[in-house]
Amino acid sequence: MKIFIDTANVEEIRKASELGVLSGVTTNPSLIAKEGRDLKEVVEEICSIVDGPISAEVISLEHEKMIEEGRELSKLHKNIVIKIPMCEEGLKAVSVLSKEGIKTNVTLIFSSMQALLAARAGATYVSPFLGRLDDIGNPGIEVVEQIADMFKIHEIKTEIIAASVRTPMHVLEAAMAGSHIATIPYKVIIQMSKHALTDIGIEKFMKDYEKAFGENK
């Protein structure tokens, strides 16, 4: 399973990229607004850091304007993926953009049926939201499993991006459920790298080395 980072914070992206684990980036209007910067400016800078799919979301809710925005965003860089919300207007936009060879990521997926429609409309990626489904008592990972099974049975090429990831356990569950990608906040990526026994082991190694080869030896 590939790892994307879910943020518009360039510094976080730079730090995560230095770990050598990133395959792409996802952003959304809320994340862009948090940075207080122009969308195109942020996206272009992200593209200079990560050589992989970079999802940039449209803000219009009418399909013709979505298409127009998508075309403009796609001109920024070859790695741009147009992120479009799951709705009737969004499906229309995905259908047109996909026929033009523009990659799309249908977001705000909360059911396997939504994912099927998005895939058939031509979406490159679908993004089911784990955390938000969990919040309403509907295990998000079950939806990911359903989508993965359905895509496999019907040989659908659309890739699954597990989104709304809040914990390392979400990442593990997504990987085991068959998600192609998990898009993860920076803090969760860092949490994934840590374990109490690792810290204890490192401390012991250092103490043992100092004891055997310290300055006074």
Curated annotation (Swiss-Prot):
It holds the Pfam family TAL_FSA. Its EC number is 2.2.1.2. It catalyses: D-sedoheptulose 7-phosphate + D-glyceraldehyde 3-phosphate = D-erythrose 4-phosphate + beta-D-fructose 6-phosphate. It comes from the Bacteria. Pathway: Carbohydrate degradation; pentose phosphate pathway; D-glyceraldehyde 3-phosphate and beta-D-fructose 6-phosphate from D-ribose 5-phosphate and D-xylulose 5-phosphate (non-oxidative stage): step 2/3. It is found in: Cytoplasm. The active site is at K83. One of its GO terms (biological process) is carbohydrate metabolic process. Its main location: cytoplasm. One of its GO terms (cellular component) is cytoplasm. The keyword Transferase applies. GO terms for molecular function: aldehyde-lyase activity; transaldolase activity. Keywords: Cytoplasm, Pentose shunt, Schiff base, Transferase. Transaldolase is important for the balance of metabolites in the pentose-phosphate pathway. NCBIfam families: fsa_talC_mipB. Belongs to the transaldolase family. Type 3B subfamily. This is Probable transaldolase. The lineage of its organism: Bacteria, Bacillati, Bacillota, Clostridia, Eubacteriales.
